[in-house]
Regions:
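Phosphate-group recognition and catalysis centered on beta-loop-alpha active-site segments
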Residues: 2-317
Length: 317
């Protein structure tokens, strides 16, 4: 059994390197999951700026739409975990994001929860963090010497009909997509979703943008890993399995189907090392400050020295 395991590792390791580099991505690819979200409030300006500063390949974000049609970066279906919605709008904390206008969301504090939950990582400036419009995330992504990659998930897309077309329209307006629906620069844009239907919609409106089919445990149990790999081959460029489905025998099957493998969400040093040994092509991580140097992508940086350079905790409004 041990010999068989080593055989899988040998066959799978680095087999996705050429395909990754052909897309213009660094290898192994580091996706800053909701930004550098171990060290700063998730999906806020400071989290994404820090991810840029430590050298993540992609800024990962969950895209939802407000009641009045504004695209925002937010993970949860409701606002209660990561904002002060219960204080600002009493009785509405269980309402979905889509029940709020952008003007309402802009009033919320999106950082104080982090200080309360992780006092050892708290910083006073986090209390001024705000929810980001996708336009504001694009401002951050375009602020460096070269554009940062964006790895964008349609979150609960069944609740937001047409969100794929809305997203593509905004990205084209901001210069991330050509009129033909291709990334303007190689390696700067990926779409991802747990929804096969959403990925099919992206095939229609922006067929040339790489697409990743996200897989969770319930999907694998219900449909089977091989069935999902076959579906992913028809839907795009790769899979994003929950981390424990990145074992080398799973990774090898995906590679043999011509798919890249980007497991989520790996935050411990041993997880990152093991995933790399298993032959994955990249990882989603809250700890891009660890993954980037561990994968030999760039030298480690002193994060404490970066904070003064990262600017305001929220966009100017």
């Amino acid at each position: 059994v041990l010999a068989l395991g080593f055989g899988y590792v040998t066959l799978s390791r680095d087999s996705g390197a050429a395909a990754t580099r052909a897309l213009g991505w660094g290898f192994p690819t580091v996706m800053a999951h909701r930004g550098a979200s171990y060290l700063a409030p998730e999906e806020t300006a400071l989290s994404y700026r820090l991810a840029q500063a430590v050298g993540a390949d992609f800024l990962e974000a969950d895209i939802q739409r407000t009641q009045d049609g504004v695209l925002i970066a937010l993970h949860d279906d409701t606002l209660e975990r990561t904002t002060d919605v219960a204080r600002v709008f009493p009785g509405r904390q269980k309402q979905p994001v889509s029940a709020f206008t952008w003007e309402e969301l802009a009033q919320l504090d999106a950082g104080s929860w982090f200080n309360a939950t992780f006092p050892d990582r708290a910083r006073p400036e986090f209390a001024r963090a705000k929810i980001l419009r996708l336009d504001e995330l694009l401002d951050i992504a375009l602020s460096g010497p070269s554009p940062s990659g964006l790895y964008l998930e349609t979150k609960s897309p069944e609740r937001f009909p047409g969100i794929e077309a809305d997203l593509v329209k905004l990205l084209a307006r901001r210069g991330y997509l050509t009129d033909a629906g291709a990334p303007t620069r190689p390696g700067t844009l990926v779409f991802q979703s747990f929804s096969a239907e959403s990925l099919r919609n992206f095939q229609t409106v922006a067929a040339l943008v790489p697409r990743i089919y996200l897989l969770d445990e319930a999907m694998v149990r219900a449909q089977g890993y091989d069935t999902l790999v076959t579906a992913a081959k028809a839907l795009g460029s790769g899979i994003g399995p929950v981390g424990y489905y990145a074992y080398p025998w799973h990774t090898l099957r995906a590679h043999r189907a011509g798919l890249l493998v980007h497991p989520y969400t790996l935050n411990r040093r041993w997880q990152l090392r093991l995933a790399r040994w298993f032959g994955v092509d990249g990882v989603f991580t809250d700890r891009c400050e660890l993954a980037v140097p561990m994968f030999g992508r760039r030298a480690a940086v002193d994060v404490d020295s970066l904070w003064p350079q990262l600017g305001s905790p929220g966009p100017a409004r």
